[in-house]
């Protein structure tokens, strides 16, 4: 399945590009010159989430933002499982296809584990790490386990697939101010049917099902990436990734770090504080 939607060029003033991965066609943007920065989104978003950050950075950085299979304008290939390790494998193919070297990797939400999984396999090509409201280790937080089990239940899977629950409910809940109607339409239009939303529905299951991958990342990220310079940009009003439980492990993993607190931002920090994030990246790595 392919997605028939053309983003508003006033909001998303980028050229769409395509990569034929081993499992399906990937949509991405590749804007600007300079050190490459790989921008990894989470659930249920796509490269559109990074639009304002890309606009702010593309004079200094080469901004590369893919849509995972099952997300954004990328294909929904029949038979693809949408597991986190599968997404990471495809993003790894994409990074190799572009020949990214000396790159910054940024991840938010599931973009953390996916980006880190790609990075540990290519540590010699990674320049630095930017993480925001994410994680890369097995979760033992009770509320996260409950969220995974509830969202994996038949009634909530029905709501995700049939009613587009993650887009309609969790994006507004995860932003400090509800996004405008036209912004919401850009998230809604790329998930137009139950068949298009299989990737969105799988990700909450992966909070528990991807534990073997997260256990491996919990070991390999410190060992292979821990010496890299890091930047943490954190939405302080996020109820999913509260700074108290999350930031101490981030700090311990990356001793050479800078923390930028985003006091008004909730989970979707790229919507709530794009200018602050871009400024922090420029100050730290520009």
Model-derived segments and their meaning:
Residues 196-252:
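Conserved serine/cysteine hydrolase catalytic core
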Residues 19-23, 29-31, 65-107, 279:
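Active-site loop/oxyanion-hole signature of alpha/beta-hydrolase fold enzymes
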Residues 139-202:
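Helix-rich cap/lid subdomain of alpha/beta-hydrolase
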Residues 101-142:
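Conserved hydrolase catalytic core segment
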Residues 29-73:
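Conserved HGGG/HGGXW glycine-rich cap/lid loop of the alpha/beta-hydrolase fold
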Residues 33, 236-239, 264-266:
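Acidic beta-to-alpha connecting loop that harbors the catalytic carboxylate
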Residues 1-37, 58-61, 96, 100-101, ...:
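Alpha/beta-hydrolase fold catalytic core
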Residues 265-274, 278:
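Catalytic histidine-centered segment of alpha/beta-hydrolase-like enzymes
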């Amino acid at each position: 399945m392919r997605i028939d939607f053309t983003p508003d060029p006033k909001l998303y003033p980028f050229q769409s590009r395509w990569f034929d991965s081993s499992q399906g066609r990937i949509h991405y943007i590749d804007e600007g010159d300079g050190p490459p920065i790989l921008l990894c989104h989470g659930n249920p978003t796509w490269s559109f989430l990074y639009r304002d950050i890309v606009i702010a950075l593309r004079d200094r950085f080469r901004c590369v933002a893919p849509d995972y299979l099952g997300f954004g304008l990328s294909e929904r290939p029949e038979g693809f499982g949408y597991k986190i390790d599968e997404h990471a494998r495809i993003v790894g193919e994409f990074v190799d296809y572009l020949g990214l070297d000396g790159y910054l990797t940024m991840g938010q939400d599931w973009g953390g584990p996916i980006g880190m999984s790609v990075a540990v396999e290519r540590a010699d090509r990674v320049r630095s790490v930017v993480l925001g409201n994410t994680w890369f280790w097995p979760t033992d937080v009770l509320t996260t386990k409950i969220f995974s089990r509830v969202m994996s239940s038949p009634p909530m899977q029905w709501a995700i697939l049939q009613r587009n629950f993650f887009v309609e409910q969790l994006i507004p809940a995860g932003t400090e101010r509800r996004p405008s109607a036209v912004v919401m339409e850009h998230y809604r239009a790329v998930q137009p049917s139950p068949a298009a939303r299989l990737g969105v529905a799988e990700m909450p299951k992966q909070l528990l099902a991807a534990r073997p991958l997260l256990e491996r990342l919990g070991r390999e990220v410190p060992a292979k990436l821990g010496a890299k310079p890091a930047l943490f940009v954190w939405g302080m009003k996020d109820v999913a990734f509260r700074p108290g439980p999350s930031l101490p492990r981030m700090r311990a993993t990356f001793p050479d770090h800078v923390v930028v607190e985003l006091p008004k931002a909730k989970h979707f920090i790229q919507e709530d504080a794009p200018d602050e994030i871009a400024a922090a990246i420029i100050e730290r790595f520009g």
